[in-house]
């Protein structure tokens, strides 16, 4: 046996120590090089409620947020007149459509207000416990924080997805800038002084690359708004965030996506109203440019005459002749209408995360 005190033993020991040191140094450098992504994935993995083959695929994240407010739309039992369930059956179909069409090119993340405290470092606000309109304001801020940290695409949970959103997303961020989608203007202040603004930007349908400086600026702006003692007084009327985004669009810092692509407009540039979605008369969407149609979920809940749709069972919806039912059926079918998308490798499974 060779002694470590012999000449050969000393040389062997020195070489061994040198190899171990080099391996440790290389390992440390490699860890530092990959740690940001690894830490991000580990953070999300920690708060998953279901197993998902997420890791190892370099895909952007697609964020779908749902609210679980205390409501009386569907009772759990005869003695219970309210619950905190989602209680909107059609949303289960819209979310399924997004997962089905986009799950092979995005890591789909299903989140709620409680997810923010888990995924955003140093986030201490309990959004679910806030009253309105503060809750929505802080929710918008938190969604921007998620986009800044992780990047990806925010998609409303009431979007009926007909085609993969990958092309829309990548064309939106091709200049390394964020993008927002155009939606119908609901802000009264935009129509003051004789102006009649039909459409404006809306951050509910938005995409951005990770660590975007413009998203960082938006976050700082929203923080200033939340620090304002008067910010609770009708923020929707003034549309502060939309005005800020519109200004950045004019400066070419943010890209505006035509509402035609998300089905809030017809091919004739006419606004798609709720009545039309719930009617049987065909709507002229673009067969090549419309990726899906956005059901105005907030309006359906606010307007009594449409609330019946929010509680209608899924099987009953799909049996009707409503336009929205036809598109829901199409979104869940196995046949793709478009043939301009190349097939994704079978090794890329659909990934869905509930956070």
Describe the predicted segments one by one.
Residues 1-139, 157-355:
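Glycosyltransferase-associated regions of secretory-pathway enzymes
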């Amino acid at each position: 046996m060779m002694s470590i005190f012999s000449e050969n033993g000393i040389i062997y020991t020195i070489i061994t120590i040198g190899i171990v040191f080099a391996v440790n140094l290389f390992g440390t450098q490699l860890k530092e090089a990959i740690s940001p992504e690894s830490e991000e994935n580990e953070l999300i993995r920690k708060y998953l409620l279901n197993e998902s083959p997420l890791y190892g695929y370099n895909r952007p994240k697609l964020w779908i947020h749902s609210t679980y407010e205390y409501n009386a739309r569907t009772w759990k039992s005869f003695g219970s007149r309210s619950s905190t369930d989602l209680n909107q059956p059609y949303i289960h179909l819209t979310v399924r459509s997004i997962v089905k069409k986009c799950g092979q090119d995005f890591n789909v993340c299903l989140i709620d207000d409680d997810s923010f405290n888990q995924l955003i470092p140093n986030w201490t606000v309990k959004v679910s416990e806030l009253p309105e309109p503060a809750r929505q304001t802080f929710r918008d801020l938190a969604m921007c924080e998620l986009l800044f940290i992780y990047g990806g695409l925010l998609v409303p949970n009431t979007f009926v997805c007909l085609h993969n959103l990958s092309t829309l997303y990548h064309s939106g961020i091709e200049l390394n800038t964020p993008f927002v989608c155009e939606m119908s203007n609901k802000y009264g202040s935009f129509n003051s002084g004789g102006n009649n603004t039909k459409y404006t930007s809306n951050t509910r349908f938005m995409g951005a690359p990770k660590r975007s400086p413009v998203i960082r600026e938006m976050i700082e702006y929203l923080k200033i708004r939340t620090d304002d003692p008067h910010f609770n007084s009708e923020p929707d009327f003034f549309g502060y965030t939309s005005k800020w985004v519109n200004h950045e669009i004019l400066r070419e810092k943010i890209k505006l996506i035509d509402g035609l692509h998300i089905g809030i407009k017809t091919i004739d540039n006419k606004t798609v109203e709720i009545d039309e979605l719930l009617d049987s008369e065909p709507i002229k969407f673009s067969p090549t440019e419309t990726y899906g149609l956005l059901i105005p979920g907030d309006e359906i809940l606010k307007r009594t005459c449409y609330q019946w749709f929010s509680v209608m069972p899924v099987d009953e919806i799909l049996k009707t002749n409503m336009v929205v039912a036809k598109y829901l059926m199409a979104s869940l079918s196995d046949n793709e209408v478009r043939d301009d998308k190349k097939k994704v490798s079978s090794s890329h499974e659909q990934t869905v995360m509930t956070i």
